[in-house]
Amino acid sequence: MKLKTPDEVPQKPGVYIMHNKEDEVIYVGKAKKLKSRLQSYFRDEDKLDRPKTQFLMRHFSYFEYILTNTEKEALILEANLIKKYRPHYNISLKDGKQYPYIKITNEDFPRIYITRNIVNDKASYYGPYTDSTHARAFIDFLNKNFQIRTCKHMDGPCLNYQIKQCSAPCVNYISQEEYNRNIRRVKLLLQGKYKTTIKKLKKDMNRYAKNMEFEKAAMLRDQIDTIKITLEKQNIQPNQDVNQDIIGFDHNNEEAAVVILSVRSGKTNKKDDLVLKGIKGFSDKQIRTEFIKQYYSTAPLPDEIILEDDIEDKDVIVEWLEEKANHKIKITVATDGHYITLIKIAKKNAHISLTENTKEEENPLLTLEKYLNLPRLPYHIEAFDISNISGIYAVASMVVFENGKPAKKMYRKFKMNTPGPNDFAMMKEVITRRYSHISPNNTNNTSDSLSIHPDLVLIDGGKGQLGMAVDVFKKLNITDVPLAGLAKKFEEVYLPGQTNPIILPRQSSALHLLQYVRDESHRFAITFHRKLRSKAFTKSILDDIPGVGKKRKQALLTHFESLDNIYNASFDEICQVKGINQKLAKTIYETLKEDKKE
């Protein structure tokens, strides 16, 4: 059921799914009391709790809800829906496709390999691994020491069997039971249960030795030695019987870096670096909570998760994780000196990771907000351009950028009513027509995209064009929409009330974004203008030529590929068009020639 208000929603646990007017899912949330939570969204914009909620409600069209029996069920459903839809306004763990997983297939004789896609195929997945080199090295170690097959089709013994790196299940040199016993050992290692693996290997080794199967016993002895050498080159931690994840966070306005120090069987076994996107407006507690929910929906679960500070809904999250792991799990805050030190190490690494990410990928919206001293992040930018030939077929374009990217479904085209070749007056007309649709009090809770108050309006031009837009806004009583003019000659940015322009650095991502917006508005206007011109050309010229019907007109367009090419074609070139004889070609050529003279 598509709902506009929460009046009919019950006070029960559940999940709500918000959509925009294009039916895209833009936010997924859960609540113990659905109605109360949803009511918090339907207030005046200045009373909404954070800027991101304001942006969300500007694009809101309707919502749906799903009731659950418990808050835990709501939590699980929310996590699954976020993973499915990846909504724009939810905090999101950087796309999991960028991180590799180790996959153990669901075959009679399973294989182990790297994948970046998790599918519902009953296979076992372990990860994500932020270091693909480490993951591949680990797979090589497992395949070699447990003699796991690597071939996709079991066609007979291969080189790996000859060099004792495969047990050759393809020709039954190993039973399915024995092979899958090795797979179970591999799974224990991937879960970080090294002591359990070694204990089981020793038990099997002693059994083989007792039965005088010395070759098999020696193989297990070598596996035990290799595991000890390979996986236990770590500093010993105080609690050697508990598997722990120690997690440190650092963040700026847009993203958070997360570092996980994984301690397995008392050894620091690996360090993972991950990124959370879309955190602007969320508290530190909310960021920690969203990370725990998203990361541990797929990652192996330790016995204890140690954080710098607490999370929301801890009891419900612990209950959910324990059900997934089938063992007790604790989420604790570091109080012991040793763990406080490890948290500091994780935070320091997160800070380094965040700094490197920021250097590599400057956020143009943040930079633009800073340089232009805007009141808010310019998430929604609108820009205009005029296209005409001496006032004929005059059109204007409006392009929209959201989050630094073209939002083409929101583009608009305008046919100009202003007479004569007056770009200045045409720009005034289109600005007036566009912004007469929005209300001065900034009520954006509607599905009409033209009612949205932009975060920045970009005018193509300098002081004069900008001043014209300022006058229009004054007449319309619009005071909360920032304006800027981009003068093309020196790429200077003009702001209302400022005499001197702002010169953005040539390599600035903010300048590149403004240029992209300006150029896109120009492209869109030119395309519309050419379409009108072409339509008028085909109607007034080709349709008036005797002998040129629909099929021959199409033949001309197919042959010459554009109307301009037809217009400039020679007599001989027109003769080459299929279905057009010399007599008709002469008529077409002379008609177009006369039209050019006019």
UniProtKB/Swiss-Prot annotation:
Gene Ontology biological process terms in this record: nucleotide-excision repair; SOS response
Chief site of localization: cytoplasm
UniProt keywords, alphabetically: Cytoplasm, DNA damage, DNA excision, DNA repair, Excision nuclease, SOS response
Classification via InterPro entries: GIY-YIG_endonuc, GIY-YIG_endonuc_sf, GIY-YIG_UvrC_Cho, Hlx-hairpin-Hlx_DNA-bd_motif, RuvA_2-like, UVR_dom, UVR_dom_sf, UvrABC_protein_C
Domain named GIY-YIG: residues: 11-91
Domain spans labelled UVR: 195-230
Protein's UniProt keywords contain Zinc: no
Record's subunit section: Interacts with UvrB in an incision complex.
Family assignment from sequence similarity: Belongs to the UvrC family.
Annotated function: The UvrABC repair system catalyzes the recognition and processing of DNA lesions. UvrC both incises the 5' and 3' sides of the lesion. The N-terminal half is responsible for the 3' incision and the C-terminal half is responsible for the 5' incision.
Protein's name in the database: UvrABC system protein C
